[in-house]
Structures are given as structure tokens and as C-alpha cells.
């Protein structure tokens, strides 16, 4: 399997697949996802796609209603061998580094990086175009230049949201540092409590998240029997060789299910 394919595909019946971004400026997003972070640009249907290990980032030209902050998905995370090195690229490209603004005032931030003791790693936050918040997590033993690490949800009910993803997708419950979390092949799903009223993701800069599913048609029937109402029912896109379905989780996250995206 190639560098930028879904490495976790085949590691389980459900793996993480993609992020889908609404963009006001496609060129700016290309500078961020490809030129700065190193995603491999690929044409795909009506969207541009940037391939990273374990995630494809789709970008389409559509005015977003807001950034990731304030929605059910606060940010997305990538792991890198050196946070400092990636921050240098981000600054050189002119994108904002927002580590200090995004962490509690009592947490030490030096050179735009913070050491997280209970995870024994350094992190930083940067802002992609259209206010897509991105966390960088250091993994010094990582051989790849960059790979998907986590999706960080905000929710009014951490326990309920975590349980829903465990029950629905078979994610393995656990923790990540001080956060409640659950794991699927290729991704950590992280949950933070937020008492504020949170917007759904559909229409915002991170419009939806995506999972790659084996036997998708049967899985959709299973979800329907459990009470899930689909915004877009299961259908096959013969021209792309994939199948898709869309629904919204009980907490406002718009979700696409795919089968066949792992071939790209």
C-alpha cells in the first residue's frame, strides 16, 4: 500500500477515511494541505483531495458558515516526528500558529509548543484557511513525515458521545492523557466537555468526517434498525467505484460512510 493511502484499511471492518472541508479559496488550502503539511494532491470527482497516511482531506469550493471552533468537531490532529520543524513550515507559509491562544493560561508555552506531561509529548496548534483548527502532536519515533492522529470532539455530554461511538462503530474505549477517548484503526476519537451551545458541522469549514466501512449496505441496514435516519441513504457511485451514505450523529457531527475509498 502506498505512502498516502489508508494504511489502517483492512485492520478492521470500520476505519477512519476522510475529512471534508468547505473552502473559500482553493489555492490557499492547497498551500496549507499540500505545500505546507505535505499531503499528496489528487483529483477526485468535484473535489480536490490531499492524501495523508490514514486520511484523505477533501476540499471543495463552498463558503463555510464558520470554522471548526464552536462546532461538534473542535479540531483535527496530525502526528509528526518534529513539531518544531512543521511549525517552521507553517510560519514560512504565513499561516497562523495559535498554540498560546488555544491552551489554558496556566499551561507553559515556549516557542509556540507545549509539553503535555501525561502524554509525554509536545503539541502545537495552527489554523488552516477558513479557520480549520489543526493540532500537531509529536511522535519522535514516527517514520512518516505526517499522519492522522485524532479528531477532537466538543460535546455537552462526554460520556454519552463516547458511548455512542463505541456502540455504533465498535471503537475501543479508553483515554488519551486526561481526555476521554476511543480508538478505531488509524484514528483516536477524543472527547472534551463544553457547556456552550455547539453548532452542527454541516456547512462549516469542516463539513463532515468520514469512515470507510466493509459491507456498507449491510451496515446501513443495521444502523437504520437502530433508529439512525439517513440524510443520504446508501447508494453506489459507479463512476467512482465507491458506495456512500450520510447521516448526522446525535451530537451534531455530519458523517459520511464510504466503501471503496481505500482504493484511492
Give the predicted meaning of each segment.
Residues 9-10, 63-68, 140-142, 196-200:
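Short, flexible, solvent-exposed loop/turn segments with mixed acidic/basic and small polar residues
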Residues 1-11, 14-24, 49, 66-153, 175-176, 181, ...:
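Vicinal oxygen chelate
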Residues 11, 17-58, 62, 85, ...:
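Core segments of cupin and vicinal oxygen chelate
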Residues 56-58, 196-197, 229, 263:
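Active-site/binding-pocket entry motifs
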Amino acid at each position: 500500500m502506498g505512502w498516502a493511502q489508508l494504511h489502517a484499511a483492512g485492520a478492521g471492518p470500520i476505519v477512519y477515511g476522510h475529512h471534508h472541508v468547505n473552502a473559500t479559496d482553493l489555492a490557499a488550502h492547497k498551500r496549507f494541505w499540500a505545500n505546507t503539511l505535505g499531503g499528496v494532491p489528487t483529483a477526485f470527482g468535484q473535489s480536490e483531495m490531499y492524501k495523508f497516511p490514514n486520511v484523505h482531506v477533501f476540499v471543495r469550493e463552498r463558503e463555510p458558515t464558520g470554522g471548526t471552533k464552536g462546532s461538534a468537531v473542535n479540531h483535527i490532529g496530525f502526528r509528526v516526528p518534529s513539531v518544531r520543524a512543521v511549525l517552521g513550515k507553517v510560519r514560512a507559509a504565513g499561516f497562523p500558529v495559535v498554540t498560546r491562544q488555544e491552551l489554558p493560561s496556566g499551561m507553559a508555552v515556549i516557542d509556540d509548543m507545549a509539553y503535555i506531561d501525561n502524554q509525554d509529548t509536545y503539541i502545537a496548534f495552527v489554523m488552516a484557511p477558513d479557520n480549520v483548527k489543526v493540532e500537531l502532536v509529536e511522535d519522535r519515533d514516527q517514520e512518516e513525515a505526517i499522519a492522522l492522529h485524532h479528531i477532537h470532539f466538543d460535546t455537552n455530554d462526554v460520556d454519552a458521545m463516547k458511548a455512542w461511538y463505541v456502540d455504533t462503530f465498535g471503537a475501543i474505549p479508553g483515554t488519551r492523557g486526561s481526555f476521554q477517548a476511543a480508538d478505531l484503526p488509524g484514528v483516536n476519537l477524543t472527547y472534551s466537555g463544553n457547556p456552550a451551545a455547539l453548532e452542527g458541522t454541516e456547512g462549516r469549514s469542516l463539513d463532515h468526517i468520514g469512515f470507510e466501512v466493509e459491507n456498507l449496505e449491510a451496515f446501513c441496514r443495521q444502523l437504520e434498525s437502530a433508529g439512525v435516519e439517513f440524510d443520504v441513504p446508501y447508494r453506489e457511485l459507479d463512476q467512482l467505484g465507491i458506495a456512500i451514505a450520510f447521516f448526522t450523529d446525535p451530537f451534531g457531527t455530519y458523517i459520511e460512510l464510504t466503501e471503496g475509498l481505500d482504493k484511492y
